């Protein structure tokens, strides 16, 4: 525990202390840590993540809750467009395994609020044409609500990376996965 690995049950029987320690958060300062695997937030408490089996290609999301934020995500986390081309993103929320489009979320590009750029009733937003860049633009969304004179976040942090290339330039494709099979047995049987 001294090194930060706090893998024991707390007074309520939860084993998520390791996650709080990893993030340097005092449990009293957060309503909870939300968690989802492949956008399924039906069992979203971080203590269940410690026993979760993860497979290649799984998407894990953790977020610190201020109050009761919903898991939010862009349906495309990576996209490439040409210069002078507009990208369209769709923002959704998950409440358990029920999904809805997220309207009224403000959009940020590389950490800067884009005035007047918010998601519509279908969760969609059309980004302005951006200049080509060597590094992808980092697109995020934020939605807040006022209650009891206090403003708080109602969705988790959602992100998407947008690469903008010169018009006519070809985007590079990379192999995401390879399946290897033992062909030696097959070859020896043929001999």
Outline where the language-model segments fall.
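Ubiquitin-like/PB1-type beta-grasp interaction modules and other compact soluble beta-rich domains
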Residues: 1-191
């Amino acid at each position: 525990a001294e090194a930060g690995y706090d893998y024991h049950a707390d007074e309520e029987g939860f084993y998520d202390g390791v996650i709080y320690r990893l993030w340097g958060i005092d449990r009293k300062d957060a309503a909870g840590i939300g968690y989802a695997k492949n956008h399924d937030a039906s069992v979203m408490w971080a203590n269940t993540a410690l026993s979760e089996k993860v497979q290649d290609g799984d998407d894990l999301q953790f977020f610190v809750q201020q109050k009761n934020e919903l898991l939010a995500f862009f349906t495309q986390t990576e996209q490439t467009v040409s210069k002078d081309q507009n990208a369209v993103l769709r923002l959704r929320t998950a409440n358990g395994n029920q999904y809805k489009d997220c309207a009224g979320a403000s959009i940020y590009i590389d950490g800067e609020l884009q005035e007047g750029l918010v998601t519509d009733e279908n969760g969609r937003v059309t980004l302005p044409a951006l200049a080509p860049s060597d590094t992808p633009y980092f697109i995020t969304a934020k939605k807040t609500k006022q209650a009891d004179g206090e403003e708080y976040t109602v969705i988790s942090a959602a992100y998407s990376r947008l690469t903008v290339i010169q018009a006519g330039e070809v985007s590079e494709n990379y192999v995401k996965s390879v399946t290897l099979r033992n062909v030696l047995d097959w070859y020896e049987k043929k001999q």
